[in-house]
């Protein structure tokens, strides 16, 4: 389920007065700034899929994720490499709240085998577990998102979050060399 542009987003917001793409320290601002963040669709999409197709209890589905976030998971070699990729370090280092998640309190990277505990994520997942999508798009989680956005010149507002609706789209189909190809229709990412 796709993210949506915030209501304050405009067609030309990434262009300077000469119509050229604005860059920041990391790269084009359209890819690497808080203004590029769309209103997340995953939570609403998962709830829609569960309502349409699910047979298990919602809270039971979310419970293992809450537990893993709170108790932690071991850092794998892949996660260690991902967190220490120079590009990602630039992204994660932009905001103290990101650094707090992806690096130890000392600022050092997590090493393979270290336990990665995400208490804040556990709290967010618990709100979703107890309240469905409203646990994300309203209440404390929505307040935390919009507070961060406001403090860091982002665009997402409480109205953006509360207006988000997941859209079920019909997949596109075609055949190629005796194979049926099924993919996401536009707009999609990697579809």
Language model features: what each stretch is:
Residues 191:
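Glycine-rich and small/hydrophobic secondary-structure elements
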Residues 1-132, 136-138, 142-188:
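Noncatalytic scaffold domains of N-terminal-nucleophile
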